[in-house]
Swiss-Prot record:
One of its GO terms (biological process) is signal peptide processing. The gene is Spcs2. Belongs to the SPCS2 family. The lineage of its organism: Eukaryota, Metazoa, Chordata, Craniata, Vertebrata. This is Signal peptidase complex subunit 2. Component of the signal peptidase complex paralog A (SPC-A) composed of a catalytic subunit SEC11A and three accessory subunits SPCS1, SPCS2 and SPCS3. Component of the signal peptidase complex paralog C (SPC-C) composed of a catalytic subunit SEC11C and three accessory subunits SPCS1, SPCS2 and SPCS3. Within the complex, interacts with SEC11A or SEC11C and SPCS1. The complex induces a local thinning of the ER membrane which is used to measure the length of the signal peptide (SP) h-region of protein substrates. Component of the signal peptidase complex (SPC) which catalyzes the cleavage of N-terminal signal sequences from nascent proteins as they are translocated into the lumen of the endoplasmic reticulum. Enhances the enzymatic activity of SPC and facilitates the interactions between different components of the translocation site. Pfam families: SPC25. GO terms for cellular component: signal peptidase complex. Its main location: endoplasmic reticulum. It is found in: Endoplasmic reticulum membrane. Residues 108-111 are lumenal.
Length: 226
């Protein structure tokens, strides 16, 4: 990835203001600001094939995820991924049972069990499709912000994105869900990927990170005011 946010000038400034906006109180704002000032992005640059839409989207997603987890110190929640893995595991279980049962009881003796396993497998695949379409959607990160006092439930931050095929417009959406009120707010931007990659296909974090920080700060500031 690109050079550190503090060395990038404007990235460092954005990090400082992010800490002030997202702090729970005046006392913790200064310490959080200092933490963000020291934060830096991994020095290893991300270089991809600019014509590979999946690689472009994945690199932008991973970098946005890195900002929330490393800059703002949020804790990732793997609930969505665990749900998908559970469904896939159950599906594989039915496939394995069918294989073993057919080996132990050759067809046609195994026919009833095979039919049950095949039907169950396709039912689980249907459940997986519904889960990814309506539950996961395009969310690639769910992160929790712990309440400093430990009295209120965790605030939840979600990142989702989209990049249509043969389109250069990348959309990143950040969703904030208050742990105390359960109110949900969203902020997003849609920009050309050309703004974030140089001619060689290297992701320019000095251009990308401030956009993510602005999304976060707009929601964090609104949360603090309310």
């Amino acid at each position: 990835m690109a050079a550190s946010a503090s060395q990038g000038g404007r990235s460092g400034g954005g990090g400082g203001s992010s800490g002030a906006g997202g702090g729970p109180s005046c006392g913790t704002s200064s310490s959080r600001s200092g933490l963000l000032d020291k934060w830096k992005i991994d020095d290893k640059p991300v270089k991809i094939d600019k014509w590979d839409g999946s690689a472009v989207k994945n690199s932008l997603d991973d970098s946005a995820k890195k900002v929330l987890l490393e800059k703002y110190k949020y804790v990732e929640n793997f609930g969505l991924i665990d749900g998908r893995l559970t469904i896939c595991t159950i599906s594989c279980f039915f496939a394995i049972v069918a294989l073993i049962w057919d080996y132990m009881h050759p067809f046609p003796e195994s026919k009833p069990v095979l039919a049950l396993c095949v039907i169950s497998y396709f039912v689980m695949m249907g459940i997986l499709t519904i889960y990814t379409s309506y539950k996961e959607k395009s969310i690639f990160l769910v992160a929790h912000r712990k309440d400093p006092t430990g009295m209120d439930p965790d605030d939840i931050w979600q990142l989702s994105s989209s990049l249509k095929r043969f389109d250069d417009k990348y959309t990143l959406k950040l969703t904030f869900i208050s742990g105390r009120t359960k109110q949900q707010r969203e902020a997003e931007f849609t920009k050309s990927i050309a703004k974030f990659f140089d001619h060689s296909g290297t992701l320019v974090m000095d251009a990308y990170e401030p956009e993510i920080s602005r999304l976060h700060d707009s929601l964090a500031t609104e949360r603090k005011i309310k």
